[in-house]
């Protein structure tokens, strides 16, 4: 919506009708035409694609556009540079549609080809327990996402019951030798409260990564000796 406003383009934004009011206000402020859609994010995507297929607009979804992953991979390039051309021992990545995880795979593969890495860093894929088609499939050794409902969760940004790139995400996580975790609602909210005490006000979806870190740290105290990166992708005002 912001880029379209700057370019003088009409922007149609499709959102779940349950989206937080704070997110809605940001979109409205840019003058976008808002289409609230009943159901989960899959229903939203279907409605947007239908409009695009009718030739009325271009569907600028970050999920389907392959160039988007060329952008998310640079996040990991920056981390490599900031750590002196090395990578942390462990990443906790929140995953719904998988844009960050797929970008990580591109970055790691290219860094290995260039001689900066000898192997993939360890990756933990994090999902909300209320909506975890990928984590469930991974734990069960399945190649396709497990059936899931569009259940309500405070981590609305990763509540994707049928991720379009689900098979690719599972293949990618296994190729990297990663693992998967789920966190429940109270674990997410508790993690968010702790982050706030550190001066980091994040949206609830972002807190899911820290919740997984806290959970795994309780099981494996030695994790405190590792270099760990937790992406905090969204500001707190987005979910309040």
Model-derived regions, located:
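Active-site/ligand-binding loops adjacent to catalytic centers
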Residues: 42-56, 110-204
């Amino acid at each position: 919506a912001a880029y379209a406003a700057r370019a003088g383009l009409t922007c149609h934004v499709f959102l779940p009708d349950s989206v937080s009011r704070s997110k809605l206000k940001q979109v409205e402020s840019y003058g976008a035409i808002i289409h609230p859609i009943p159901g989960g994010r899959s229903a939203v995507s279907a409605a947007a694609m239908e409009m695009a297929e009718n030739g009325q607009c271009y569907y600028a979804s970050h999920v389907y556009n392959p160039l988007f992953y060329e952008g998310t991979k640079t996040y990991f390039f920056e981390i490599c540079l900031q750590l002196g051309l090395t990578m942390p021992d462990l990443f906790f990545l929140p995953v719904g549609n998988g844009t960050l995880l797929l970008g990580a795979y591109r970055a790691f593969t290219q860094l290995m080809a260039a001689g900066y890495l000898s192997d993939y860093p360890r990756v933990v894929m994090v999902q909300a327990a209320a909506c975890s088609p990928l984590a469930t499939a991974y734990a069960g050794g399945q190649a396709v996402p497990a059936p899931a409902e569009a259940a309500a969760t405070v981590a609305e940004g990763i509540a994707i019951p049928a991720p379009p790139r689900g098979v690719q995400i599972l293949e990618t996580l296994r190729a990297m030798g990663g693992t998967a975790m789920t966190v429940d609602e109270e674990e997410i909210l508790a993690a968010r409260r702790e982050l706030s005490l550190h001066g980091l006000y994040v949206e609830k979806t972002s807190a899911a990564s820290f919740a997984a870190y806290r959970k795994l740290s309780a099981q494996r105290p030695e994790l405190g000796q590792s270099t760990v990166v937790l992406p905090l992708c969204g500001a707190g005002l987005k979910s309040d």
